[in-house]
């Protein structure tokens, strides 16, 4: 007889195809709803293309997995269950579009960011970049509304649906606060940025909506009580931070790759745990060099090479790798000592392993 974890693994292997089909149909079926005329039509096409771009779909898959782990019995093909999962993917796209405007990024999933798509449609007119950014912000807001409406329109029991919406909106507020932290910490010298502030930013900006939201919402829709939802959220926090450190390390290895001057958090002046660890473990003269390179914000090969040398010299990569593994172990210990059933614990391990496998080379986007 197959174990619950084995059955979950098999079901999750089938889930991406089910979700991708539902995602494509969702935008096809909503074409008339968003038929706002000639000016908006190409934006809806771009919106559809952006959301349906090939991605890992970590958030919807975690929601589906959590729903099953905690006893939900609807099939993964159930329309309302898929709508709940889709709400997280729409939320993710809303966040990415706004994030790309803030960072002035040009590529997302190896294709143009949304504001660059709009800019390209406008052609060579004065202010195309500004208009592209403005339109992208508004389209992001529309996706936010779509996300809320998609979750609201599920046929779960009203009490469950209302509770899910309440959690969902709280996660959005947390993400916004994390974005503010990211922006404001980016204006500070690395010497004035505390590790605790970076960890808080990671938790608010990404961990809550990427890991806690799907797992808690899936469990909630399966009927899990508030005490166990709080326990689940506490359990997820070190896992989420570990995955964010993994993202830092992946990006650093990409930073050291062939395209050394492409946009990265390091060159954009973002304050990461990797940079803070490097600063903490350098001697004073090297700290000054690191501060100088980070303050220039110029993507020239000399500054890039110096940052790389200083990070390597500090041993920060090894330190962060150790911290990441320690956080994963902390979560495992907490899971083993939790009040969840053996089957639920095994299911959560399977979910964490799935995410780790899918993100070990390219992160969580």
Predicted regions and their residues:
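All-alpha prenyltransferase/terpene-synthase fold signal
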Residues: 1-365
């Amino acid at each position: 007889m197959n174990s619950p974890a084995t059955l979950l693994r098999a079901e999750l292997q089938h889930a991406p195809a089910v979700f991708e089909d539902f995602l494509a149909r969702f935008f096809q079926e909503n074409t008339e709803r968003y038929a706002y005329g000639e000016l908006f039509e190409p934006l809806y096409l771009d919106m559809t293309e952006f959301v349906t771009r090939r991605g890992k779909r970590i958030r919807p898959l975690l929601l589906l997995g959590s729903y099953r782990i905690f006893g939900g019995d609807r099939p993964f093909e159930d329309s309302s269950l898929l709508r709940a999962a889709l709400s997280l993917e729409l939320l993710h796209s809303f966040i990415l579009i706004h994030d790309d405007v803030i960072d002035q990024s040009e590529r997302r999933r190896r294709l143009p960011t949304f504001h660059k798509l709009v800019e390209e449609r406008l052609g060579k007119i004065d202010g195309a970049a500004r208009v592209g950014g403005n339109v992208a912000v508004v389209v992001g807001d529309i996706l936010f509304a779509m996300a809320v409406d998609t979750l609201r329109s599920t046929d779960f029991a009203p009490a469950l649906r209302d509770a899910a919406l309440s959690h969902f909106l709280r996660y959005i507020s947390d993400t916004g606060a994390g974005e503010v932290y990211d922006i404001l910490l980016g204006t500070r010298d690395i010497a004035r940025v505390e590790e605790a502030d970076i960890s808080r930013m990671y938790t608010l900006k990404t961990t809550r909506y990427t890991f806690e939201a799907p797992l808690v919402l899936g469990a909630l829709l399966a009927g899990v009580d508030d005490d166990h939802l709080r326990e689940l959220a506490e359990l997820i926090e070190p896992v989420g931070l570990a995955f964010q450190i993994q993202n830092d390390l992946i990006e650093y290895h990409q930073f050291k790759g062939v395209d050394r001057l492409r946009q990265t958090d390091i060159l954009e002046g973002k304050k990461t745990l990797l940079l803070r660890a490097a600063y903490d473990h350098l001697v004073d003269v090297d700290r000054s060099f690191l501060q100088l390179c980070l303050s220039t914000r110029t993507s020239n090969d000399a500054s890039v090479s110096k940052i790389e040398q200083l990070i390597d010299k500090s041993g920060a990569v090894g330190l962060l790798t150790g911290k990441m593994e320690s956080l994963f172990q902390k979560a495992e210990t907490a899971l083993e000592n939790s009040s969840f059933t053996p089957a639920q614990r095994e299911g959560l391990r399977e979910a964490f392993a799935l995410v780790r496998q899918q993100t070990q080379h390219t992160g969580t986007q």
